[in-house]
């Protein structure tokens, strides 16, 4: 019975063990599908299921018929034009990170948008070049393709060997196709959950480190220095060493241009951020500075007068598709997997933000398919891997973009540049593109502030951020990502391997039990210990669990058991020789000079000392906490009941089951009753299947709650001094109620407590 009285509640019910609860309340039989059942369901097909699959594979079929032309079209047009202009500039700039000519960045900004329009589930993200992925692809290109013209690479694009450029483009395209295939396979296999292994802290630390890599890699373009390309661990330090050893060769014109562009871009981005509510659209500062820089470079003939590096030849139209290299596949499978996972993680996290903001669903597996197909098409047409750039997606959303129609229109802008006006960008300095690339890193570089916030919230997450950053900086992006994931998983193991176990006590004299160290006024029944483990118990932490339990109770049950068995052997010898008598006042030893050989006892097999104590052959009972014969001393223990709170223990493995049963047996053999509370039915069923129970450890030790176990102990022990019992009421039945004012107490008008075992 449950009765609500104001802000209190009164509960009257029997005290239940898990076994008696199951006997009184029968569970319904549920049919659990087997693997064959799931296989049949996957292989079966109906018209309704086929329609559902088609709609999931092509989300455009769901939202395009419901498109509100009058309400959304104008906003999408404005957003598409703004996003397209940004995409053009970012494509050109991020191509430098891949170590290929800027023109190929336009392909990377065009093809993924087209495929995502049909296959994507997010309405607001802008798919295309992303600096972190561009940097990761560039690292692979640098490693696979050796540069024969490193010293003259920066002078002009025309000095680069055509076959060398084609080889770099082939590697970038092959890596992109392979990462797309990996994403497509993961999506088809419905394993989009892999992104959960990249926590927000890890992604933040990794992208911040990638931003540092981008910053360092662009120094050679901003200063126009002949810096060799490095791809091995510590490459960032080698690049910095090369830059500073050649700093006297800096092209002043490129340096001044870069600084001016960088300062102006940062200032106007701050203005856009601060006054975004007042501006109808963000100021397209990248476009404005690109137009100005191109005009000045062309009008003043910077290339000939100051020897600056320019974009150079921009062939109009598309190049024919290529077949990816299988050899590159074999050499870059690990890098491609990292690119695939990072690209999906970034895109999915940004898409999730907008889906929550505008209240529409996204499908992680379908996003994998969409990104995979996008990268496959992009790589086939000589583009490089993409995801979603935060700044570009922000432009698409902030300028009023409602659907991917805005993305399609942005692709039209890129298309116009590719087929018609790309040649106008030929005088543009590469240092300007480098400065624009750095201008888009502000958000990622600002993530350093996460360290302080994470330190206050969660030390483990803060450590993950710091170590991820260090790994990515020192080892490079590929190895750094792998090491970061491994470290993150290690922290999870560490948290479960060393859980914060605690001893609980009653708070408020009700059914509430909390860590007794956290409260001043607690009640802990004499001889009862409540121990809580807040994590799964498995092979790695069963030893830690046992040690913490021993620390909580204050003694080792195995040590007590062995000492009692040793003492029992001595008592048997004394009794057989007639040297001991049992009286109501205790033992009387008739020979004070009797001494047994400790060495003889110590040489007994340990297995015998670990067996249950058996006193049936003696004509008297032994009170191990009472007085024992002379020369026989063993530690006395006041504990008679131990409650293990397993409400947070989600699973046990086979190894830990054996260890747990051994621990329980040790306590039971020294007459300490053990109770386990808070487990679910599946937990107990698994123990039964694994033959956990025996004559000593039975399923009757399981109770629904801590309070059920406490009430059972109080009634079983029938305390004469407990505040829960009264010596004047020993002859009548005990009754309890839960009351927030008086706690557990006896009342004259009671609901009988039924103890069922």
Curated annotation (Swiss-Prot):
It catalyses: hydrogencarbonate(in) + 2 chloride(out) = hydrogencarbonate(out) + 2 chloride(in). One of its GO terms (biological process) is membrane hyperpolarization. N-glycosylation is required for efficient cell surface expression, and protection from proteolytic degradation. Glycans are attached at residues 149, 161. One of its GO terms (molecular function) is chloride:bicarbonate antiporter activity. Expressed in spermatogenic cells. Expressed at high levels in cecum and colon and at lower levels in small intestine. Residues 93, 146-176, 223-250, 300-335, 389-404, 484-757 are extracellular. It comes from the Eukaryota. Keywords: Antiport, Cell membrane, Chloride, Glycoprotein, Membrane, Transmembrane, Transmembrane helix, Transport. CDD domains: STAS_SulP_like_sulfate_transporter. Residues 518-713 form the STAS domain. Residues 1-71, 115-124, 198-201, 272-278, 357-367, 426-462 are cytoplasmic. A motif (PDZ-binding) lies at residues 754-757. One of its GO terms (cellular component) is brush border membrane. It is a multi-pass membrane protein. InterPro entries: S04_transporter_CS (IPR018045), SLC26A/SulP_dom (IPR011547), SLC26A/SulP_fam (IPR001902), STAS_dom (IPR002645), STAS_dom_sf (IPR036513). It is found in: Apical cell membrane; Membrane; Cell membrane. Belongs to the SLC26A/SulP transporter (TC 2.A.53) family. Mediates chloride-bicarbonate exchange with a chloride bicarbonate stoichiometry of 2:1 in the intestinal epithelia. Plays a role in the chloride and bicarbonate homeostasis during sperm epididymal maturation and capacitation. Interacts with PDZK1. Interacts with CFTR, SLC26A6 and NHERF1. Interacts (via PDZ-binding motif) with NHERF4 (via the third PDZ domain). This interaction leads to decreased expression of SLC26A3 on the cell membrane resulting in its reduced exchanger activity. This is Chloride anion exchanger. It comes from Mus musculus.
């Amino acid at each position: 019975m449950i009765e609500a009285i104001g802000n209190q509640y009164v509960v009257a019910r029997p005290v239940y063990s898990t076994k008696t609860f199951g006997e009184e309340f029968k569970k319904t039989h549920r049919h659990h599908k087997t693997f064959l059942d799931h296989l049949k369901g996957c292989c079966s097909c109906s018209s309704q299921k086929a329609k559902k699959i088609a709609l999931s594979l092509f989300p455009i079929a769901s939202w395009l018929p419901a498109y509100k032309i009058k309400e959304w079209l104008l906003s999408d047009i404005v957003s598409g034009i703004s996003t397209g202009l940004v995409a053009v500039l970012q494509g050109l700039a991020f191509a430098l990170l891949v170590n290929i000519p800027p023109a190929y960045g336009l392909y990377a900004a065009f093809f993924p948008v087209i495929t995502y329009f049909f296959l994507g589930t997010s309405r607001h993200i802008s798919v295309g070049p992303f600096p972190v992925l561009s940097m990761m692809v560039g690292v692979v290109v640098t490693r696979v393709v050796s540069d024969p013209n490193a010293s003259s690479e920066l002078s002009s694009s025309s000095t680069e060997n055509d076959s060398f450029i084609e080889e770099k483009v082939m590697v970038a395209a092959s890596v992109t196709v392979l990462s797309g295939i990996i994403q497509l396979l993961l999506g088809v296999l419905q394993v989009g959950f892999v992104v959960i292994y990249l926590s927000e802290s890890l992604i933040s630390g990794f992208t911040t480190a990638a931003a540092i890599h981008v910053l360092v890699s662009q120094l050679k373009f901003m200063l126009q220095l002949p810096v060799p390309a490095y791809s091995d661990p510590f490459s960032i330090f080698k690049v910095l060493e090369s830059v500073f050893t050649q700093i006297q060769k800096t092209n002043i014109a490129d340096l001044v241009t870069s600084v001016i562009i960088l300062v102006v871009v940062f200032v106007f981005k701050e203005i856009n951020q601060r006054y975004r509510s007042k501006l109808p659209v963000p100021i397209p500062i990248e476009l404005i500075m690109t137009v100005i820089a191109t005009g000045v470079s062309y009008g003043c003939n910077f290339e000939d007068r100051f020897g600056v590096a320019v974009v150079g030849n921009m062939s109009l139209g598309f190049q024919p598709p290529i077949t990816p290299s299988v050899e590159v596949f074999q050499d870059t499978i690990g890098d491609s997997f990292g690119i695939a996972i990072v690209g999906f993680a970034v895109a999915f996290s940004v898409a999730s933000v907008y889906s929550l903001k505008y209240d529409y669903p996204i499908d992680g597996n379908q996003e994998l398919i969409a990104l995979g197909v996008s990268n496959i098409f992009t790589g086939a047409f000589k583009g490089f891997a993409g995801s979603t750039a935060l700044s570009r997606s922000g432009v698409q959303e902030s300028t009023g973009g409602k659907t991917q129609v805005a993305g399609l229109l942005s692709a039209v802008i890129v298309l116009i540049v590719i087929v018609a006006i790309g040649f106008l960008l030929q005088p543009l300095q590469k240092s300007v593109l480098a400065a624009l690339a750095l201008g888009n890193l502000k958000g990622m570089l600002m993530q350093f502030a996460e360290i302080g916030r994470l330190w206050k919230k969660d030390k483990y997450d803060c450590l993950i951020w710091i170590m991820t950053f260090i790994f990515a900086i020192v080892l490079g992006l590929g190895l750094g990502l792998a090491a970061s994931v491994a470290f993150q998983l290690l922290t999870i193991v560490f948290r479960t391997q060393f859980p914060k176990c605690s001893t609980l006590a009653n708070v408020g004299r009700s059914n509430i039990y909390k860590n007794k160290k956290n409260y001043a006024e607690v009640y802990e029944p004499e001889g009862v210990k409540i121990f809580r483990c807040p994590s799964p118990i498995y092979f790695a932490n069963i030893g830690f669990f046992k040690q913490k339990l021993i620390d909580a109770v204050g003694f080792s049950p195995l040590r007590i058991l062995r000492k009692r068995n040793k003492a029992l052997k001595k008592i048997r010898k004394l009794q057989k020789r007639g040297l001991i008598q049992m009286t109501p006042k205790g033992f009387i030893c008739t020979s004070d000079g009797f001494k047994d050989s400790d060495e003889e006892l110590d040489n007994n097999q340990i297995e015998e000392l670990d067996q249950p104590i058996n006193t049936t052959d003696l004509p008297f009972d032994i009170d191990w906490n009472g007085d024992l014969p002379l020369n026989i001393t063993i530690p006395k223990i006041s504990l008679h009941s131990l409650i293990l709170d397993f409400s947070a223990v989600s699973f046990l493995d086979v190894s830990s089951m054996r260890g747990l049963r051994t621990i329980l047996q040790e306590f039971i053999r020294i007459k300490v009753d053990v109770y386990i509370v808070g487990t679910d039915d599946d937990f107990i069923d698994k123990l039964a299947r694994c033959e956990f129970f025996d004559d000593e450890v039975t399923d009757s030790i399981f109770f629904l709650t801590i309070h059920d176990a406490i009430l059972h102990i109080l009634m079983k022990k029938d305390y004469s001094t407990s505040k829960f019992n009264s010596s004047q009421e020993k002859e009548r039945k005990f009754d309890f109620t839960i009351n927030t004012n008086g706690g557990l107490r006896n009342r004259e008008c009671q609901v009988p407590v039924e103890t069922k075992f």
